[in-house]
């Protein structure tokens, strides 16, 4: 997380019914461990077995696209659907990560800005570790990573 200590980092978070419980638990964890975060919750705001992940995830992507958020965490049942939807928006680099290595490396090598997870795949303890890896990693601005990122950005 790179902002000065007096600047809040805006993190947008979303979930459908498959990730609602995990999202609510993560919000508590984030508020406690990362007080420098401004957490923007774009839903779901209550458990609804009939809600659809594209609605919440597209709102999450829009927040980042509009510059209202720096990073995002999108949760659905598997993380896959959220990843597909998030990547539809220009400037979004989303990936499903269910381990700490991928979460950190996704940021370090690819400047990933949206972490997608499956609420039916991982438990809260695993999710906390993965989220920490995602938030604490920084893009490595070596030539090869910058070159690759530029190629990715041209695909937008």
Task: For the regions a language model picked out, list residue spans one by one.
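Short active-site oxyanion
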Residues: 10-11, 69-72, 91-93
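Short, solvent-exposed amphipathic alpha-helices that sit
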Residues: 21-32
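Short, structured active-site "lid" loops
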Residues: 54-74
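C-terminal binding/interaction regions
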Residues: 6-21, 100-156
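Mid-chain, well-packed structural core segment of small domains
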Residues: 74-120
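SAM-dependent methyltransferases
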Residues: 1-10, 33
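Short glycine-/acidic-enriched loop or helix-start segments at secondary-structure transitions
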Residues: 23-24, 83-85, 126-127
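A short beta-strand-loop structural module common to alpha/beta enzyme folds
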Residues: 37-49
């Amino acid at each position: 997380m790179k902002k000065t200590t007096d600047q809040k980092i805006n993190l947008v978070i979303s979930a459908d019914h498959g990730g609602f419980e995990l999202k609510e638990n993560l919000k508590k964890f984030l508020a406690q461990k990362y007080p420098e975060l401004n957490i923007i919750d774009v839903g779901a705001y209550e458990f609804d077995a009939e809600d659809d992940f594209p609605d919440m995830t597209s709102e999450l992507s829009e927040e980042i696209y509009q510059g209202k958020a720096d990073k995002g965490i999108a949760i659905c049942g598997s993380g896959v659907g959220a990843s597909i939807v998030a990547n539809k928006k220009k400037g979004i680099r989303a990936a499903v990560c269910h381990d700490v290595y991928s979460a950190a490396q996704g940021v370090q090598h690819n400047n990933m800005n949206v972490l997608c997870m499956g609420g039916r795949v991982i438990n809260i303890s695993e999710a906390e570790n993965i989220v920490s890896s995602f938030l604490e990693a920084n893009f490595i601005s070596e030539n090869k990573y910058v070159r690759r990122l530029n190629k990715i950005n041209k695909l937008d």
